[in-house]
């Protein structure tokens, strides 16, 4: 979500560069885009989204309210509170070999999130 917000101009180049510097200094350079929405010290230290983050962006014809919800199993209640506010969902999945498959296993987090989204009425 952070990369999309940077590309759309919602996160300025200056803000993004600050996230790049800060994440590199913390030894988490690959988290620079995530830090666009994960702004608390705890989220940044742990490397996971904990609370639902909000942002807004506009296209030519539509105003979007973005809710970035946690994906970690410890924060499923927070994910549910974010998803319950949504009209549509975008489930971002890990594409690393092994991680992707684990997410869709019977006890996988991706499978659980997809099931929760459907049970909350998100059809798209």
Where do the protein language model's features map onto the residues?
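P-loop NTPase switch module centered on the Walker A-proximal segment
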Residues: 1-77, 86-99
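Conserved C-terminal guanine-recognition region of P-loop GTPase G domains, centered on the G4
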Residues: 82-83, 89-124
């Amino acid at each position: 979500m952070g990369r999309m917000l940077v590309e759309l101009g919602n996160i300025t180049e200056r803000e993004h560069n600050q996230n790049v510097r800060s994440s590199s200094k913390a030894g988490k350079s690959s988290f620079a885009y995530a830090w666009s929405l994960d702004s608390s010290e705890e989220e940044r230290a742990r490397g996971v989204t904990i609370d639902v983050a909000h942002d807004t962006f506009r296209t030519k014809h539509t105003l979007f309210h973005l809710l970035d919800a946690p994906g970690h199993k410890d924060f499923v209640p927070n994910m549910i509170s974010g998803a319950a506010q949504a009209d549509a969902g975008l489930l971002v999945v890990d594409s690393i070999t092994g991680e992707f498959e684990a997410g869709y296993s019977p006890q996988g987090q991706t499978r659980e999130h997809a099931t929760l989204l459907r049970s909350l009425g998100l059809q798209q």
